[in-house]
């Protein structure tokens, strides 16, 4: 199994907690490789994370993406969000071609069950599996041309990278971001929803529980 994160040095404690939660609940049938897109993670913190993952008999690979904005090819206004949020759109750019499926997790997520449950989901021919986000209002849906469509949360993604590459999803997403620079509330999440709306497999809400969802109860 391949798990992907995009984090900077400030998010290392949260990433460590996430990795611990993944392996603590994993059945162990399949090996896990943790792929970390690193934007400035120090050598000391990389070493500590590597030692921790090795103790769990799993694998960890770092990718230096400190120059990831060069791959974007344009300047982008994230409206106050950390610029690294856009890096997940470049997953096919940085990950090896032999990786055909990947789970993306926000670094501050905690996994409470076996991650294999998500890994083995049937995407039904879609490019990406995402969990619906119930807190988005009509005005934002209209702005993204999503009337009549579900809006989805990008904190957890199950991606068919083979299809992502063959259908040029990255180019489409980056083109959309460039055209909407500074006018997307949730940046990459909005882009994923707007561009891939017909290619998203809606996953069960049990696979992603957010504080926003808790507040709505």
Show which residues each predicted segment covers.
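N-proximal low-complexity "stem/linker" segments adjacent to membrane-targeting elements
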Residues: 1-7, 13
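Catalytic core of tubulin tyrosine ligase-like
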Residues: 164-183, 201-203
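Short aromatic/hydrophobic "clamp" motif used to bind/position activated sugar donors
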Residues: 102
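Single conserved hydrophobic/aromatic residue that forms the stacking wall/gate
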Residues: 209-217
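Acidic donor-binding segment of Leloir-type glycosyltransferases
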Residues: 33, 38-63
């Amino acid at each position: 199994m391949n798990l992907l994160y995009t984090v900077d040095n400030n998010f290392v404690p949260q990433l460590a907690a996430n990795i611990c939660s993944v392996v603590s609940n994993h059945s162990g049938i399949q090996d896990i490789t943790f792929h970390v897109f690193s934007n400035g993670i120090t050598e000391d913190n990389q070493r500590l994370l590597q030692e921790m993952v090795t103790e769990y008999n799993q694998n960890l690979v770092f990718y230096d993406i400190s120059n990831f904005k060069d791959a974007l090819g344009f300047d982008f206004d994230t409206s106050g969000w950390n610029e690294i949020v856009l890096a997940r759109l470049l997953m096919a750019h940085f990950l090896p071609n032999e990786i055909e499926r990947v789970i993306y997790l926000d670094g501050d997520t905690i996994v409470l069950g076996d991650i294999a449950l998500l890994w083995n989901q049937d995407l039904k021919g879609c490019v990406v599996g995402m969990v619906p986000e119930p807190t988005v209002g009509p005005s934002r849906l209209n702005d993204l041309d999503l009337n009549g469509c579900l809006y989805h949360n990008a904190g957890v993604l199950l991606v068919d990278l083979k299809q992502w590459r063959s259908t040029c999803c990255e180019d489409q997403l980056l083109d959309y971001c460039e055209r909407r620079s500074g006018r997307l509330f949730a940046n990459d999440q909005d882009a994923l929803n707007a561009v891939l709306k017909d290619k998203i497999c809606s996953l069960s809400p049990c696979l992603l529980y957010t504080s926003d969802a808790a507040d709505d109860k």
